[in-house]
Amino acid sequence: MTERISITPTHRYRNNDKLIGIGNEFWDMSERNGLAGLVADLDSGVLRTTAGHEFVADGHEFINFSCCSYLDLDSHPRVIEGGLDAMRRYGVLDHCIARSRVQIPAMLELEDSLGELFGAHVVCSIAASTATFGLLPLIASGHLGNGIRPLMVFDKNAHISMSNLKPVCADETEVVTSPHHDLDFIEDACRKYARVAYVCDGSDSLGGYAPVKELAELQDKYGLLVYYDDSHSLSAYGERGVGYVRTHSPVLDERTIVVVTLNKAFGTSGAAIVLDGYEKETLRVIERFGGALNYSQLLNTAAVGAGLASAEIHRTPELTTLQDRLYRNIELFDSLVHTEQTGSTYPIRLVPLSDETVIEAGRRVFEAGFYVSPVFFPIVARGTAGLRVMMRAGQTEEQIRRLCAVLTEVGACPAIPAPGEAAR
């Protein structure tokens, strides 16, 4: 019998052996220490573990400081009622057919509302990752852009929902990875290639914003296309909650594409693709050839109704009130614990710890009544582990002060008092 061929992976764009081999050990440690696989009932902002977790006692109460609902809109009465109202109006949960063939008007209603909110054309998707899966290959082939196949430059820290598309895009064009927010690298690519597309987070899941204004200069100079996932700043930042990118970028045309999830501060479900300057024919190409964007798994009617209600809240002074509460809570945290994100409006703080101590620290914080998620490779680079703290508008001063006291006990750096403050 002829010897069968074994395959040697190229590992050019991903390496599951490395990701799983190293990362799974941390996940197993997290679960053994009660920091993963948790199931808990939620009542008035307090979570209580249920029976069934091998390593966590039933009935342990804790406050979740790793939730992305930065404005707590996911529990807003108007948002909940909006989902119910849409169900009553349309009389169906999910009209299961590709929207390019037949659709009920529910998602069109949400797209129109979000389009007015953003001042742009909006296409909705079931998830931001689904939107990215549909759009990046079209950018790589030149069908979304100016017709020229671009060099696809993925930021080293781009979220996995984007970086996972490297091998798919590489079947259409050349793909490279840049150091994090390295403007010189990007400009050098722009000088060499007729067209360049840069793929990055507008707001990083580990804290911080993209250099939007500096990238806009490269857009004006070279025609650079920038694809932003700005999910973590939607609603939490900017007038009417339009997010960091659309607040600060002076290039809001076909050279800037923004994808945002509606699951975080917006408080509902699904995602929005925010487009400027694209003709109807191009939008049809997205609808027809954007992969899962055109499958029968669309936003269900309840999610649409909740989205409509949240969008209406964004048009009222209540949004500013919630943003201000969030910012005050961020400032309070920064006055007690120092991180690299101190002083920014970004709602995520990363408390750096070693790979060896991060799980134990997270366990001690959990035992004290708070959940903060430990992050480790492959979520972050090896040797840069930490506890990820997410601030929300609904957190109380007492909760924040208690959490910060526990964090400093497990190794967080206390904040440096302002001049004159220590003497009080």
Where are these regions (language model features)?
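Conserved core segment of the aminotransferase class I/II
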Residues: S269-P317
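Conserved N-terminal alpha-helix of the aminotransferase class I/II PLP-enzyme fold
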Residues: I80-A127
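Conserved PLP-binding active-site segment of the aspartate aminotransferase-like
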Residues: S30, C67-Y70, P347-E356, F370-L407
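Conserved PLP-anchoring active-site segment centered on the Schiff-base-forming lysine
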Residues: L138-S161, E174, S178-P179
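Active-site PLP attachment segment
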Residues: H248-R284
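N-terminal "arm"/small-domain region of PLP-dependent enzymes with the aminotransferase-like
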Residues: T2-L93, L224
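Active-site phosphate-binding strand-loop segment of PLP-dependent enzymes
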Residues: V175-Y227
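Conserved PLP-binding catalytic core of the aspartate aminotransferase-like
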Residues: T320-D334, H338-G369, I379, M391-A393, ...
